[in-house]
A protein has these predicted regions:
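RNA pseudouridine synthases
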Residues: 1-300
């Protein structure tokens, strides 16, 4: 594959990672092995690329992943012939990947729901949108391709309702507000996202529900759906989600990941046209943390 450099003066390995889906480490490995060419010539990773340089690189082979239906406990909030609404537990990965070939939501769906849309390919049947592994809460699942197309279009057009609850660090100065800051892949850590001028539009609305001094319970409404959006936006304004190892401080509430729960999900039913809305209360560990905060029993 080839890409053309638009911004010069940066290292070859960084430029390749920025311009492609390759990680910095994979880019370095390909450069070391002579698989990356600059204008037809091999260069070292420290080479400073120039505007107009053509980079040729290799697309890594996709590792085939076997997936099977698994009888994993799954809370199905709603289900009909077109749609299922699932309350995903914290700690469950949504779809199989190289590091997670079993125990995922897809494995559970194949067992409990069976009929699923195929638009997103064999590894993501029925998956219209995702939430992070350590985020709990509601997801819409498409059971056929027509439903999938309509639900995905509604998400793209910002017509779906997605509200989250989060316990965040600090005492927010305002009871409500809007965070409008573009999000893209972090230049410092390719595994993370960040607010960046080169990123895509990202809008999050927040409303304070309870204050606990060092922590605040907030309701967050997504207008866009970027990767890690709430976690990145809250960290950006200085109030990271409690328990978030990637974007928050080390000293935080004790739990099994970030205290973030997709509580409310609303959308137009793809067959009936009816606007439907579902709510799932936060899991026990989230509720227990709230009770301790209310009693000033900080669990840091």
């Amino acid at each position: 594959m080839e890409v053309r450099v638009e911004i010069g003066g940066i290292r070859l390995d960084k430029a390749l990672a920025d311009l492609t889906d390759l990680s910095r480490s994979v880019a370095n490995e390909q450069i070391k092995n002579g698989q990356v060419l600059v204008n037809g010539q091999p260069k070292k990773a420290k080479y400073s690329v120039q505007v107009g340089d053509v980079l040729t690189y290799q697309i890594p082979e996709v590792e085939e992943i076997d997936y099977v239906a698994e009888d994993i406990p799954l809370e199905i909030v709603f289900q009909d012939e077109d749609v299922a609404v699932i309350n995903k537990p914290q700690g469950m990965v949504v779809h199989p990947s190289a590091g997670h070939t079993s125990g995922t939501l897809v494995n559970a769906l194949l067992y409990h729901v069976k009929d699923l849309s195929g638009i997103n390919g064999v590894l993501r049947p029925g998956i219209v949108h995702r939430i992070d592994k350590d985020t709990s809460g509601l997801l819409m699942i498409a059971k056929n391709d027509d439903a999938h197309t309509k639900l995905a279009a509604e998400l793209k057009d910002k017509k779906s309702l997605r509200k989250y609850w989060a316990i965040v660090h600090g005492n927010l100065p305002n009871d409500r507000g809007v965070i409008e800051a573009p999000i893209g892949r972090s230049e410092k850590d390719r595994k993370k996202q960040a607010v960046t001028a080169k990123g895509k539009e990202a809008v999050t609305r927040f409303q304070v529900l309870e204050r606990f001094g060092d922590y605040t319970l907030v309701e967050l409404t997504l207008e866009t759906g970027r990767t890690h959006q709430i976690r990145v936006h809250m960290a950006y304004i200085g109030h990271p989600v409690a328990g978030d190892e990637a974007y928050g401080p080390r000293k935080t509430l004790k739990g099994h990941g970030q205290f973030l729960h997709a509580r409310t999900l609303g959308f137009t039913h793809p067959r009936t046209g009816e606007v439907v809305e579902f709510t799932a209360e936060a899991p026990a560990i989230f509720q227990e943390a709230l009770e301790k905060l209310r009693k000033a029993e900080y669990i840091v």
